[in-house]
């Protein structure tokens, strides 16, 4: 696992938070990202580690809530 719960990611000018990570089929990490809408509802999406690596290469990561 490379990415931590609470890390922020910007995708298409929208901030997403890593809310969950789990081991998928085989040995692949899967990450659940969540975005809170203004009405309090949440939108979620799941990405595998390869997709997350692509976001890191394009500068999508904002930072960690641990800092």
Q: Whereabouts are the PLM-identified features?
A:
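Intrinsically disordered, low-complexity, charged/polar segments
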Residues: 39-67
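Basic/aromatic-rich interaction segments and small domains that mediate binding to polyanionic partners
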Residues: 12-49
